[in-house]
């Protein structure tokens, strides 16, 4: 379910007077020394740094998440899943058990910690959907990615039963001598997404979306619509928290208000003030209104004031984080406990590596051409491993990867040329041809 509405608005600087003059290197090093708030890492083991990949509809699938994790991202959020689709089994439900798209199923044991985001219009349905997700989490012995299996029963080494896109048998990993680099990469991707998960499989928390600004969502009384109706929003929050076992954290995604009227500001305050008593672990607050969508600057000054008014609440910030420096500017200026990195990490998984480098007292390193190629190959191969069992999987993957290729191109000296070439990609051969031409064979 898209909450980005194919948004293509240009990056804008946040409203944060004096923030541009901050020494982000010193700030990052200080944050690295003190670490993330211990309450967060206690609730979500493995969430060890104050930033994470946001849920991005149409983007944050298993492939994007796994690539981000390989570059230092400590935690990811799925795109928003509709409660009714989860309960009734809509388009794609049989493919993956969850949501509209198979992309939201945990991508194997490496795709953790993972927070699943849900969105809906009726408290009982939202509660039931949350319970269904938790039940999915408890199926620790389930094969989440039954990819290209033969007629044999899945074994403890499912890679032995997998086939590559040409139908050839994929051998054990690591492959024996004689396999091409392409076969090795694909085998690695298949293993990553197909091996049997252990007891940590599933989702580590439930995130309730009360922020989505897309018009069709608002009209159906979902997402950001509820910021205009605090009574309904609180009813949903209470129903989900009551239904979910206490040991599993529930969180919420908000925007700073529905619009800029005093009435809507009071509505936000009423919702936010209820979170602790209901039992929500934290709130991620996007510093734009619902009516703004993604247009115009976000108000970091609002986040700063919110943190000051609620010093005991865990608050994450979102909005206008386009580079690694914005991560640390936001933390320092607003006082939020962690930063949700959204559009700024599309085609830029290195933002997470750079953040860890700065926290360790080092300068952030730009990706080399070779590193760009490796990340793009990994992203494509994992996407193909996940989708190839569906009809026209290679073509669908290639077309889907266009939007990522265009974003990855921003790091390349010939980015404009690459973007033009990416528009027409419709096969794995075409994708790899562009990489060979511009990124080296």
Where are these regions (language model features)?
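Glycine-rich, positively charged N-terminal anion/phosphate-binding segment
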Residues: 23-45, 56-147
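Conserved radical SAM core fold
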Residues: 74, 81-87, 120-123, 210-224, ...
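Intrinsic-disorder-associated, low-complexity terminal segments enriched in Asp/Asn/His/Tyr and depleted
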Residues: 141-144, 152, 161-164, 177, ...
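Short secondary-structure transition/capping segments
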Residues: 88-92, 218-221, 264, 295-297, ...
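Alpha/beta enzyme core
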Residues: 131-145, 149, 186-206, 210-220, ...
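Alpha/beta catalytic cores of nucleotide-metabolism and tRNA/nucleoside-modifying enzymes
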Residues: 1-47, 52, 57, 63, ...
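Conserved beta-strand positions in the central sheet of alpha/beta enzyme cores
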Residues: 77, 115-117, 207, 251, ...
